Every structure is written in C-alpha cells, then in structure tokens.
Amino acid sequence: MFLMVTGFMNYSQQTVRAARYIGQSFMITLSHANRLPVTIQYPYEKLITSERFRGRIHFEFDKCIACEVCVRVCPIDLPVVDWKLETNIRKKRLLNYSIDFGICIFCGNCIEYCPTNCLSMTEEYELSAYDRHELNYNQIALGRLPMSVIDDYTIRTIQIK
C-alpha cells in the first residue's frame, strides 16, 4: 500500500513539473508574439550595413607603393603583388595587384597595416559567382566602387537597431 501511495506522489509531482515546464514554454512563445518579424525578403529588401562592416576590399592603384606589407600581415599570404624595380629612380613600380575572394577571410589586416591607405573595406557583400575563378579580382576589378544600397531605388533598405 505504501509503495502505491509513494508511486502516486511521484506521478503527481512529475505531472505538476511537466505542466510547469509546458506553461513556461508557452509564456516564452507568447512573449515573442508581440515582436516584429525578423525575416528579410532578400532580393527586394537589404540591410544597411554598419560602418565597420568588412565587405569587399577596394584598391586604389595610384596610392600603392608596392611595399608588400599587406602580403606579410595576411594570415594566408593572399594578395598577389607584382612589381618591377625602376633602376633610374630606384623605386618599385606596381605592375599587378590581385586578391582571390574565394580564399580571403576578410580579417582586415591588410587594410589596417597599409601605410598609404590604398586599401579599404566596402559595404559590398554579394560576391557570388558560378565559377570560383571569377572571384579572383585584379586591380581593375578591385578599383571599382560598389553601388550603394541606399541609392538603389529598386531595393527597400532596412536599418537594424
């Protein structure tokens, strides 16, 4: 008889505990009902990125002195800098500069340590391509400034607070 009573007590305690857990979960669900949806309809709506966002790298060919600091500070030795030594003026002349965004980890070390500030991060994050070789940007592709999301009238921008 005593075992039956203790078994019934355990069963009732477990039932009350389960009802409490279900009630707590339901209260959390109801608290989320008042919030606005966080889903963004991507091609038609885009987020305005913060000013510290690490997007595609922008390169200014005229400012670069081919010092290769960006290559030395890159954790994966990614930027490819081709230069030629001009013997008459004893300076390096930049021939080619390229970055493969299929490999880049967007750490920002190259931008931070560049002595001439010829590298900067843009707000562009749409770098998808059908072929991974299209992600290898030379100095001409790196020099193009992206179109601002705010200026595009076909897209509704959303500010996250």
From Swiss-Prot:
E.C. code: 7.1.1.-
Gene Ontology CC annotations of this record: chloroplast thylakoid membrane
Any one biological process term the GO annotation gives: photosynthesis, light reaction
Main enzyme class: translocase
Catalytic activity line of the entry: a plastoquinone + NADH + (n+1) H(+)(in) = a plastoquinol + NAD(+) + n H(+)(out); a plastoquinone + NADPH + (n+1) H(+)(in) = a plastoquinol + NADP(+) + n H(+)(out)
Binding site for [4Fe-4S] cluster 2: C74, C104, C107, C110
Gene3D superfamilies given in the database record: 3.30.70.3270
Keywords annotated in UniProt: 4Fe-4S, Chloroplast, Iron, Iron-sulfur, Membrane, Metal-binding, NAD, NADP, Plastid, Plastoquinone, Quinone, Repeat, Thylakoid, Translocase
UniProt-annotated binding residues for [4Fe-4S] cluster 1: C64, C67, C70, C114
Membrane topology: Peripheral membrane protein
Domain of life of the source: Eukaryota
Details of cofactor binding: Binds 2 [4Fe-4S] clusters per subunit.
Cofactor(s) annotated in UniProt: [4Fe-4S] cluster
Domain 4Fe-4S ferredoxin-type: 55-84, 95-124
GO terms, molecular function: 4 iron, 4 sulfur cluster binding; iron ion binding; NADH dehydrogenase (ubiquinone) activity; quinone binding
Subcellular location field: Plastid, Chloroplast thylakoid membrane
Oligomer status and interactors: NDH is composed of at least 16 different subunits, 5 of which are encoded in the nucleus.
UniProt record similarity statement: Belongs to the complex I 23 kDa subunit family.
Function: NDH shuttles electrons from NAD(P)H:plastoquinone, via FMN and iron-sulfur (Fe-S) centers, to quinones in the photosynthetic chain and possibly in a chloroplast respiratory chain. The immediate electron acceptor for the enzyme in this species is believed to be plastoquinone. Couples the redox reaction to proton translocation, and thus conserves the redox energy in a proton gradient.
Protein name, UniProt field: NAD(P)H-quinone oxidoreductase subunit I, chloroplastic
